[in-house]
Amino acid sequence: GYKIENTIIFESMITVDNILKLGDPRLYENCAPLTRDELPLVENWVKDLHEAMQDIRKRYGFGRGIAAPQLGIMKRLFYLHLDRPYIIINPEITDPSTDMFELWDDCMSFPNLLVKVKRHQSLTLGYLDENWEKQSWKVEGAISELIQHEYDHLNGVLCTMRASDDKSFKWKE
């Protein structure tokens, strides 16, 4: 064998370049539920999701959530970074309000495009956390919208498919 001196090996960082872009067929697929056996993989997946989100925030100035399929991980998992990190495994939405609100939505898979969509004002999110413990979270407003956006990704639905009408698109500088 031989020894290489003064060599620094950098672990590769996940960046915006790793995020699947609009048109990638994987973004339109239904994701599979995680099994308990896959729980040990979640830590690395979340690290990758966090790094991608941080890069988007740095370059584009937005990003509160990212879904596993956006990195080609076809599992029912998303990651939110709000007041603290939230790891959301096998989520289910219940009790969506009949009250809706309209907003301009953005997405890491097409960071320069805004899409006008209607979302439920409130909902309840049931999910498993990183310890495989059941959680229930009643949310409204901006957090409700964010959860609906990320949940859609797990079902192969993009906000472009929920546009309010055919004029509900605009470019973001």
Predicted regions mapped to residue ranges:
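Positively charged
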Residues: I8-E173
